[in-house]
Curated annotation (Swiss-Prot):
Modifications the protein undergoes after translation, according to the UniProt entry: Methylated by PrmC. Methylation increases the termination efficiency of RF1.
The protein's name: Peptide chain release factor 1
GO-annotated cellular components: cytoplasm
N5-methylglutamine modified-residue sites: Q236
UniProt KW RNA-binding keyword: no
Organism: Lactobacillus delbrueckii subsp. bulgaricus (strain ATCC BAA-365 / Lb-18)
Entries under InterPro entries matching the protein: PCRF (IPR005139), Pep_chain_release_fac_I (IPR000352), Pep_chain_release_fac_I_sf (IPR045853), Prokaryotic/Mito_RF (IPR050057), RF-1 (IPR004373)
Length: 361
């Protein structure tokens, strides 16, 4: 904790400097600079507050130890001992919380994401489960106050999805959903199963951070643009004008569809932004083989034996195999109540990170 303490002292000094800067009229007048400063202050606030509480508790313990050493008032001594016991527990908890807050930040944690869900092993049932996962993530996003838009999809005849790509925007989206990468296995009786037998199917989920201000030039000749009528929410505007836009990047086959904006021009702009992000991700991997390997590494092959999580409908049970977490709350989880699962995954991986740092210290 000693090396962490030195970092915390420096952090507190910087925090006080930032608070002074936030009251400086020159900084306030510079909108960009002021936004940078307020973000830095917000990022530091929690750890500085906990560090100050940690120091205050330490001082209080020292004061109580003086009372105990004096020993002239037995009643005060007993109270000081009880208080120190509680403070020691609080300090221990604060140490753990501070260590986690001081862990190196994932540079992508604040970013929005593109999530791709594909029906894998299991035919029609896998495609239906892909649709169920889509709705689960949509409801979770709604609970978080995030926005979701479908950017590409291929539905099946039974109403499921062979594949669907969505963009989720909001506060710290990637930090919450980055652990959803992988094969998700479902065990249930398909609606098409007359004998009532439980089947096992899978769908894969890939989560990719959305790149901001991607510096890539796309040749307009290599982009096919299709316009069509919007469907879904939108009131009387629906199906009266061709405002929805689908863009296909011909060299890579990457497709983006956008219909959530109010006009074709807005949909074109948003679709191009997302297309650039996805093409950039593709070319960052050098070639399609590396791109496919990257995606496969994220989601696996989708084989039934591969899974990060199992959704067992007959037993109303969800098991995350990476951390051995089992919850008999499948109905609630499929309704978007993912917090308990995501929080447990976050704690698990933060703990692993702390252990690795301790080993290398």
């Amino acid at each position: 904790m000693d090396n962490v303490m030195a970092q915390l002292e420096s952090l507190e000094v910087r925090y006080e400097e930032i608070q002074e800067m936030m009251a400086d009229p020159e900084v306030i007048a510079d909108t960009k600079r002021y936004m940078e400063i307020t973000k830095e202050e917000a990022d530091m606030r929690e750890v500085v507050q906990k560090f100050r509480k940690f120091k205050a508790d330490k001082e209080e313990i020292a004061g109580n130890k003086e009372i105990i050493a004096d020993g002239s008032d037995p009643e005060l001594v007993e109270m000081a001992k009880m208080e120190n016991s509680e403070l020691e527990d609080e300090i221990s908890q604060l140490e753990d919380e501070i260590k986690i807050l001081m862990l190196p930040k994932d540079p992508n944690d604040d970013k929005d994401i593109i999530m791709e869900i594909r029906g894998a092993a299991g035919g029609d049932e896998a495609s239906l489960f892909a649709g169920d996962l889509l709705r689960m993530y949509e409801k979770y996003a709604e609970n978080q106050g995030w926005n979701v838009s479908i950017v590409d999809s291929e539905q099946t005849e039974v109403g499921g999805y062979k594949r669907v790509a969505i963009m989720i925007t909001g506060n710290k989206v990637y930090s919450k959903l980055k652990y959803e990468n992988g094969a998700h296995r479902v065990q249930r009786i398909p609606v098409t199963e007359s004998a009532g037998r439980v089947h096992t199917s899978t769908a894969t989920v890939a989560v990719m951070p959305e790149y901001e201000q991607v510096d890539i030039d796309l040749d307009p000749k290599e982009i096919r643009v299709d316009v069509y009528r919007s469907s879904g929410a939108g009131g009387q505007h629906i199906n009266k004008t061709s405002s929805a836009v689908r863009m296909t990047h011909l060299p890579t086959g990457i497709v983006v569809a956008m219909q959530d904006q109010r006009s074709q021009q807005q949909n074109r702009a948003k679709a191009m932004e997302i297309l650039k992000s996805r093409v950039y991700d593709y070319y960052e991997s050098q070639n399609r083989d590396k791109y496919d390997a990257k995606r496969k590494n994220a989601v696996g092959t989708g084989d039934r034996s591969e899974r990060i999580r199992t959704y067992n409908y007959p037993q109303n049970r969800v098991t995350d195999h990476r951390i051995g977490l089992t919850l008999n709350k499948l109905d609630r989880i499929m309704n978007g109540e993912l917090d308990e699962v995501i929080d447990a995954l976050t704690v698990y991986y933060q703990t692993k990170q702390l252990e690795e740092l301790a080993e290398n210290a």
